[in-house]
Amino acid sequence: MKMNQLLEAFWYILPAYFANSSPVVLGGGTPIDFGKKWRDGRRILGDGKTWRGFFGGLIVGTIIGIVQYFLLPEYYGSLGIAIELAFLLSLGTLVGDLIGSFIKRRLNMPRGYPAVGLDQWGFLIAALCFAYPVKTIPTGEVLFLLVITPLIHWGANIFAYKMGWKKVPW
């Protein structure tokens, strides 16, 4: 795989990365599950998933796509496609993260507890699925993202921890 293909894969997924990380800074407030519990007596999602974080991530990810369009318009072809793709990547990311939290609560994993694989790939796979109708990337680029995303995820978590945005470095 050529370097420009690796950069293109990274460029493609950038709105998802921003949507996934921005709730750490923008979140707080009312939990998406409103404090309700599932049939197993555990919270549906937990306090870490809030409406402010969800919509903040959606907005930030979409804005990243708009900025990308103005930096490299030929990649998207139109502003409308850039907005649609960034929105779907961001929405998929956030929905994938919610699904991951739901699964973690069912497994009785506490908030913030690392779930290797689920935390790193759940949002990525959901983002790629949501964006599929608008724009896809070659299989090699998807595989590259599956390899690089855990490294970026862990690095971003350590950075957020050192900045005081997260209580734990994972």
UniProtKB/Swiss-Prot annotation:
Protein name: CDP-archaeol synthase
Gene Ontology CC annotations of this record: plasma membrane
NCBIfam families, alphabetized: PRK04032.1
Transferase recorded as keyword: yes
Catalytic activity: 2,3-bis-O-(geranylgeranyl)-sn-glycerol 1-phosphate + CTP + H(+) = CDP-2,3-bis-O-(geranylgeranyl)-sn-glycerol + diphosphate
HAMAP family per record: CDP_archaeol_synth
InterPro entries: CarS, CarS_archaea
Cofactor(s) required, per the database record: Mg(2+)
GO molecular function: CDP-2,3-bis-(O-geranylgeranyl)-sn-glycerol synthase activity
GO biological process, one term: glycerophospholipid biosynthetic process
Pfam families for the chain: CarS-like
E.C. code: 2.7.7.67
Topology term for the membrane: Multi-pass membrane protein
Pathway(s) it belongs to: Membrane lipid metabolism; glycerophospholipid metabolism
Organism, scientific name: Pyrococcus horikoshii (strain ATCC 700860 / DSM 12428 / JCM 9974 / NBRC 100139 / OT-3)
Functional summary from the UniProt entry: Catalyzes the formation of CDP-2,3-bis-(O-geranylgeranyl)-sn-glycerol (CDP-archaeol) from 2,3-bis-(O-geranylgeranyl)-sn-glycerol 1-phosphate (DGGGP) and CTP. This reaction is the third ether-bond-formation step in the biosynthesis of archaeal membrane lipids.
Keywords from the named record: Cell membrane, Lipid biosynthesis, Lipid metabolism, Magnesium, Membrane, Phospholipid biosynthesis, Phospholipid metabolism, Transferase, Transmembrane, Transmembrane helix
